[in-house]
Design a protein with these regions (language model features):
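Short glycine-aspartate micro-motif
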Residues: 1-2, 54-56, 121-125
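Short beta-strand scaffold segments in enzyme catalytic cores
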Residues: 8-12, 61, 130-135
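Glycine-rich phosphate-binding loop and adjoining helix at the ATP-binding site
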Residues: 23, 31-43, 47, 51-55, ...
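Short glycine-rich, Thr/Ser-proximal phosphate-binding strand/loop in the N-terminal lobe
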Residues: 1-37, 139-168
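Short, structured loop/turn "capping" segments at alpha-beta junctions
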Residues: 97, 116, 132, 141-144, ...
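Hydrophobic, well-structured mid-protein blocks that either form specific transmembrane helices
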Residues: 105-143
Length: 173
C-alpha cells in the first residue's frame, strides 16, 4: 500500500518477481489527512483485495520502527503515532510501514534498474511531496528526505520541485 497526499493506493505484488498481480486500487486520501480516517481507507484497500497476510506500506514521512516522526504532507497529529500498530489494529492484518521513497527504492534495488548496482543509487519520487530513497552499495540510508532541504524563498525544496508545485503554479510538462 502506498500512502500519498492525494490518494492511497494498493495492489497485490508477487514478492519473488516484483510483478503486480492485481489492478491497482486507489481511494482518495481523506481531506483531514488525520490518522483514524486514513487508517479506515487503508483497511478498505485491504478488504477490497480480500487479502489475509502481512502488508507492506510506504508512508510519506520519516518512519522509525513503525512510528511516524514527522508530519510530511499529512496532519501534525501523525507525529508519534505507531503506524504499524494502528494499521494492524484497523485492518486485522500485520503491517510493516516505512518511508514511501525508501519503499520505492527497495523495489528498484530488488526488481528494477537498481538491482545489482553498487555505489550510490538514489530513487526520487515526485508527487504531493518530493521523496528520496538513498542506497550505498545496496544498503539503505533510511529517511534521507532530500525534499525537506531548505531552498530559497520556499520552506523546503519539495515546495518548489514536487508535482504539487506544478499544479499550484499552473505549469505543464
Amino acid at each position: 500500500i502506498d500512502i500519498g497526499g492525494t490518494g492511497i493506493k494498493g495492489d497485490i505484488v508477487n514478492v519473488e518477481t516484483g510483478e503486480m498481480i492485481t489492478e491497482r486500487h486507489r481511494i482518495p486520501t481523506p481531506s483531514s489527512r488525520k490518522p483514524d480516517e486514513m487508517a479506515e481507507v487503508v483497511a478498505q484497500i485491504v478488504e477490497h483485495f480480500k487479502y489475509k497476510g502481512p502488508v507492506g506500506c510506504g508512508f510519506p514521512s520519516i518512519v522509525k520502527e513503525g512510528v511516524c516522526k514527522s508530519e510530511g504532507n499529512l496532519h501534525k497529529s501523525w507525529v508519534g503515532v505507531n503506524i504499524d500498530e494502528l494499521f494492524t489494529k484497523v485492518s486485522g492484518q500485520p503491517f510493516t510501514v516505512l518511508n514511501d521513497a525508501d519503499a520505492a527504492g527497495y523495489a528498484s534495488m530488488n526488481y528494477g534498474v537498481g538491482k545489482g548496482r553498487n555505489g550510490l543509487v538514489i530513487m526520487t519520487t515526485i508527487g504531493t511531496g518530493l521523496g528520496s530513497g538513498v542506497f550505498h552499495n545496496g544498503i539503505l540510508l533510511p529517511n534521507f528526505e532530500l525534499g525537506q532541504i531548505p531552498y530559497k524563498k520556499f520552506k523546503k525544496i519539495e515546495d518548489w520541485a514536487a508535482a504539487s508545485a506544478k499544479e499550484r503554479e499552473g505549469l505543464s510538462y
